[in-house]
Regions:
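N-terminal leader segment of winged-helix/HTH proteins
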Residues: 1-46, 164
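Charged, amphipathic alpha-helical coiled-coil/dimerization segments
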Residues: 2-12, 87-147
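Alpha-helical hairpin
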Residues: 16-19, 48, 111, 137
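Pre-recognition alpha-helix immediately N-terminal to the DNA-recognition helix
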Residues: 26, 37, 54-57, 117, ...
C-alpha cells in the first residue's frame, strides 16, 4: 500500500466514524510514510532493502550469531524469506553461515567484519532519518506518544469491563 493510498483512506474516514478507526488510519498512514521514506533512502544510499537491513540489525545485536529459525521468528517471516536474504548478504560477504556443532543440519548466521562496518554506517544514517522524520514532534510529545503506544501495545484498556 502506498503512502498516497493511506492518505486517501484517512481522508475517507469521516468525522462520524469512531475515533478508534480514525486513529488506526492515522497510525497506518504515518507508519507507511516513514517506512516508505526509510526504504527509499536505504535503497538509494546503501543499495540495500529494508528486510536485509533488519536481518543485519538482528545479527548486530547477537555477535555470536543466530540460527536461521531464530532469525525467521524474530523477523516474523518464513524460513524461505530468511534463506533468500541470507543468500544475498552472503554473496556480498556481509554475513557468514557456520554449521552448528550440535546439529549439522542447522546453520548459525553472523555478520562478517565487512558486514559490521557496513551496518554501522547504515544504522547511523537510519537513526538520523528517524530523528528527522519524527522531528515535527517535540521531545516531550515523542515521550507522551511512546507511553501511549506502550499502553496500546500491552492491550490494557481503561474502558474494558471485567466479565465473570
Amino acid at each position: 500500500m502506498s503512502a498516497r493510498q493511506d492518505t486517501d483512506m484517512e481522508v475517507r474516514a469521516h468525522a462520524d466514524h469512531h475515533a478508534s478507526l480514525r486513529l488506526w488510519l492515522r497510525l497506518l498512514s504515518c507508519t507507511t510514510r516513514i517506512e516508505d521514506t526509510i526504504r527509499q533512502r536505504l535503497r538509494e544510499q546503501f543499495d540495500i532493502t529494508l528486510p536485509r537491513f533488519d536481518l543485519m540489525a538482528q545479527l548486530e545485536r547477537e555477535p555470536q550469531g543466530l540460527s536461521m529459525s531464530e532469525l525467521s521468528r524474530r523477523m516474523m517471516v518464513t524460513g524461505g524469506n530468511v534463506t533468500s536474504i541470507v543468500d544475498q548478504l552472503e554473496k556480498e560477504q556481509l554475513v557468514q553461515r557456520q554449521m552448528q556443532a550440535t546439529d549439522r543440519r542447522s546453520f548459525t548466521v553472523s555478520l562478517t567484519e565487512a558486514g559490521r562496518k557496513a551496518f554501522a554506517a547504515m544504522a547511523l544514517a537510519h537513526e538520523g532519518w528517524v530523528v528527522e522524520l519524527l522531528g515535527p514532534l517535540a521531545e516531550n510529545e515523542q515521550t507522551q506518544l511512546h507511553a501511549l503506544l506502550g499502553t496500546l501495545k500491552s492491550g490494557k484498556s481503561k474502558h474494558s469491563k471485567e466479565t465473570k
